[in-house]
Amino acid sequence: VVMAFDEQGQAETADRKVAVLERAYRLLTDRAGYHPSDIVFDPAVLAVGTGIEEHNRYAMAFIETTRRLKAAFPETKVSGGISNLSFSFRGNDTVREAIHSAFLFHAIRAGLDMAIVNAGQLAVYEDIPPELLERVEDLLFDRRPDATERLVQFAGPAQGEVRKKEADLAWRNGTVEARLSHALVHGVLDFVEADLEEARSAHADPLAIIEGPLMDGMKVVGELFGSGRMFLPQVVKSARAMKKAVSFLQPYM
């Protein structure tokens, strides 16, 4: 694993990051004998939203560096520690999760192969409220000079405080089929058995439940993952929900 860091210190711009990592690549392959596929670049994810103008392009610098590195060295992997990005908003989990999810959405499209991230704190890109997503992406792409201020205002009085995110249970008001599909898409295990018991009273054949609402949910997961709007840790949570559902139904089949 090679960081974008040399004798001059931490590389901050895309040009510097690429130059440092290109040099490291040559040293590793030409002198040390490493195969390109054994090298992982970490261009360093740096904090945005700090109030310091020079930091405004840090997210863009990482994404642009990733794109250029993958074009030049396709066999070499690119990684990054995502939590650094939102350090300015520590204490506001809702905003931080949205920042991480939106950043990953765009970084993966640029070629990011892997990331260090809290898998339990990743929002599904499509589920980020539009008003929050707009402000987050304004910040990530430095689209307006007041991007940081607008996101801070949106974060509200919870900025700097530890805030617990309350689960939105509005989806529990839907049909049992809709609830099962929702549980699979979002990896929610709490209500699976109760909902399956209710579904069994409406469907004589348990296989109909699997082929109906459960597979409907997994199709959505596949579409979201395939389009980059859902990430692997979230897919794993969905798979666990599916496994729990099928295990519950097996004795009745």
Residue ranges and their predicted role:
Residues 1-42, 46-77, 83-253:
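ATP-dependent carboxylate/acyl-activation modules
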